[in-house]
Each structure stands twice: as C-alpha cells, then as structure tokens.
C-alpha cells in the first residue's frame, strides 16, 4: 500500500444533497472535527482556523465537484493563502450507486487524505488514522441525529481501498485504463470475449471470468478538477449481479502540493456487502491490489521508468521532474512477466 495515502469511510443515513451541502460549509468543521475551528473567513470558500495535527493555524479552502452519479468536494490546507500543501478529496456515493436499485436510504462518505513526505511530521502519520476515523464517527452522528436518528445506522456495505504510486504521466494512465483493449493485460481474472466499443470517455465490452461466466464491462472517465475518477462496472448478466469499483487517479503534484512531484496515485474504491460473501467478481481486496500492481508495472515501462517498480508501492521524495529521464523515448508496454 502507498505510505503517503490514507482513506477512511462511513455510511451515513441521510440524503446525498444534505450531506454535500453540510460538507461545503467550512464553518461546520467546528462541530465534528477534533480541533479544526474556523476563526476568520477570508473569502466565500476559505477560512483561517486551528488544526488538530499542528501547533499553528492553517488556511482551509473548499472546492466542489459535481456528477450525475455522485457528489464530492476537496478540502485544501496550507500555511499561506492560496498556497496549499494538503488536499483531501471527499466522495459521496448514494446507496443506489453502490447497489443499483437499492432501497437503502443513505450515502457512503469516503475521505481520501494525502500527506507530502517532505512536510509530514511523525505525529501526522501516527495520528491520522485515529483522528480521521473518529472524526468520521462524529460526522455520522451529527448528520444522523439531524435526520432524526437516536443510534448509529448500519450500512449494508463497507468500503475497502487499495492505493499505489505509478511513475508515469497522469494522462497516459487515464487513456490506458479507460481503453478496454488493455484489460486483458492488467486484469488477470478476465478474458476478452467479443467486440469492444470505445469513445473518448471510456468503453464497454464482453469478457469471461475465471469460471467462464459472462461479464459485461463498462468503463467511464470523469475529469474532476485536477484529477480523474474512472468508473468501472462489472455486470454478470446470468446472475443479476453488478460489482462497481471506482478508480481515482490524482497527480502527485496535486496530492502533495509540489509542482515537481511526478507520477500519480492510483486509488481503488471497493464496496463489500456486510451480510454475505461475494460469489462472483473479485472476492477480496488483494484481487484489486494485484491489478493495480500490474497497471503500475506496465505504465512505468511505457513511460521509460524501469527502475521505479522495484522500489515499492509508495511515492518518494526522489521522484521529481528534476530526476526524470529527460528525452527518454516511451517504451512499448511488455505483456510478459
């Protein structure tokens, strides 16, 4: 797993628009965070406030992104106005997105955090899981209380994630992942069976899984501010089952607030039913992780960065544009191991 990335999630029994509007108001951080207290408003989307992980104040800034399937925001933090070095994308997936046709009333809140390895402190990395997980619990309690609940609602699904650093340009990664003709190379549990159709935002096609069961795959890419969310739907028509696993790819220059940081973070978001094990599709988070490793290896080879793969799954300070291979010709992707 990528060392500079942390994600936490929670099911909240409220509607998507209510959750979105609440999160867009930075002043509401006063109510549910450990110690982010807004002191002075700078502009409609920016405040100066205290911080849970530092002994000094920070600027807090919010951006919004909209989609017809889900909603989301980004929180940005930094010590100077409009100079932000921490970014926190937040996604709100309605229950009907996780399970099409579901009668569950609620939203799955997914909070993604990046900490620049140049600026992070030991306390930030040692405390981020504890603090963000507890803050999610606080947010859930407030929003469900406002919705009339007197105890914590239990969602039908839980979210699990897998993140990895890819030493290749973001646009190459987005094109490669959305092109279903590449799926045979990196998705080892699927085999193409039939025609593929592609357009500029994705494609669809027919595949067989490891049990020779039919799988209709649909991929759709969405540009969200400075990163992409790539929807991946795997429909099993003979079993009336669909597995959704959105993929977020965000450039390291944005994730870490460093213009010289090269490559991108690949973050897989997966949904797992709480009441029964899956019988079709990917059955464990390691299946998604293995695919991510394949994508990393193949894309880094295409970008000419053949030394990065052996150094592990995480972004390191040495991975800057100053240390990139200048003038190197992209290598063709090799499909052999």
Give residue spans per PLM region:
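Hydrophobic pocket/interface hotspot
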Residues: 18-23, 29, 47, 62, ...
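Beta-strand/loop substructures that line and gate deep hydrophobic ligand-binding cavities in soluble
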Residues: 76-141, 146, 231-301, 306-308, ...
């Amino acid at each position: 797993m990528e060392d500079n990335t942390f994600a936490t999630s929670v099911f909240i029994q409220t509607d998507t628009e209510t959750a979105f509007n609440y999160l867009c108001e930075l002043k509401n951080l006063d109510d549910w965070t450990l110690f982010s207290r807004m002191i002075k408003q700078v502009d409609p989307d920016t405040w100066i406030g205290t911080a849970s992980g530092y002994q000094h104040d920070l600027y807090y800034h919010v951006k919004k992104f909209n989609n017809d399937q889900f909603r989301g925001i980004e929180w940005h933090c930094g010590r100077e106005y409009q100079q932000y070095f921490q970014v926190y994308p937040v996604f709100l997936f309605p229950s009907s997105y996780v399970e099409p046709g579901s009668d569950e009333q609620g939203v799955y809140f997914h909070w993604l955090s990046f900490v620049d390895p140049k600026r992070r402190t030991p306390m930030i990395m040692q405390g981020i899981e504890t603090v963000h997980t507890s803050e999610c619990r606080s947010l859930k309690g407030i929003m469900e209380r406002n919705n009339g609940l007197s105890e914590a609602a239990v969602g039908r699904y839980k979210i699990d994630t897998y993140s990895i650093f890819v030493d290749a340009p973001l646009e190459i990664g987005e094109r490669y992942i959305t092109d279903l003709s590449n799926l045979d190379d990196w998705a080892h549990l699927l085999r193409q069976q039939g025609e593929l159709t592609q357009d500029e935002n994705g494609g669809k096609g027919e595949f067989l899984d490891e049990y020779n069961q039919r799988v209709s795959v649909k991929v759709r890419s969405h540009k969200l501010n400075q990163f992409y969310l790539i929807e991946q739907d795997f429909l099993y028509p003979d079993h009336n089952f669909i597995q959704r696993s959105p993929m977020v790819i965000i450039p390291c220059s944005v994730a870490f607030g460093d213009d010289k940081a090269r490559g991108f973070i690949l973050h897989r978001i997966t949904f797992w039913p709480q009441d029964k094990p899956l019988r079709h599709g990917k059955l464990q988070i390691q299946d998604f992780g293995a695919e991510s490793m394949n994508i990393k290896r193949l894309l880094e080879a295409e970008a000419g960065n053949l030394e990065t793969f052996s150094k592990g799954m995480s972004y390191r300070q040495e991975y800057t544009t100053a240390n990139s291979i200048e003038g190197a010709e992209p290598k063709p992707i090799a499909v052999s191991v």
